[in-house]
């Protein structure tokens, strides 16, 4: 009878599930809106285009092996919630989602502008008194420089104008051009006196040349005496006899 009793199975120990690690990437709606606004396609962005953009920008933070399936499921839920609008095989942002995205982008730029005036804080004014202290330390140096002109014997330099009397040496320079003008005049005078000397030398030469011509004229009568011409008629007379 005891064998017919059903055996009671011992309950299995429940295995503790590993705690899910919080994702380091932003939520899917934020990644999808960023992808659609960055791609700027008129007819909307397709699933492959959105997947490529998200993997390129947030791939390091996504550790889901089934990321393509989870992305497609997320897009379908966003269309049902009215956050996205599906046009054929592409997805666009709804008007409500566009306004949210623009409103989220404006406050990010505003704190940066507010941080700029904070940098221009009063510490720069604290540096100003330090510069004043440095200027005070420099002032005694300038006073010492003001005392130096008393000891400097610069008035002696005023005696140097004695050397300025050297311009009187210009007088010998003026004598030199005067001497140059006198020398050419003296050289021109002897040249004119040399001309009559040449005329005196020409007169004796003409007298000497005239005397030999007269001697030649006296010799000519000696050649004129030819008595031999008279003897020829005697020979002719002998032939006649």
UniProtKB/Swiss-Prot annotation:
GO BP term, example: negative regulation of DNA recombination
Biased composition (Basic residues): 11-20, 99-111, 156-184, 194-241
Species of provenance: Volvox carteri
Keyword terms of this UniProt record: Chromosome, DNA-binding, Nucleus, Repeat
Record-annotated DNA-binding residue ranges: 183-186, 203-206, 211-214
Domain H15: 24-95
Role: Histones H1 are necessary for the condensation of nucleosome chains into higher-order structures.
Biased composition (Basic and acidic residues): 1-10, 129-155
Positions of region (Disordered): 1-27, 89-241
Domain of life of the native organism: Eukaryota
Single GO cellular component term: nucleus
Sequence repeats mapped onto the chain: 111-116, 117-122, 123-128, 184-189, 190-195, 196-201, 204-209, 212-217
Full protein name: Histone H1-II
Region described as 8 X 6 AA repeats of P-K-K-A-[AK]-A: spans on this chain: 111-217
GO molecular function: double-stranded DNA binding; nucleosomal DNA binding; structural constituent of chromatin
Annotated compartments: Nucleus; Chromosome
Any Pfam family the entry gives: Linker_histone
UniProt record similarity statement: Belongs to the histone H1/H5 family.
Keyword Repeat attributed: yes
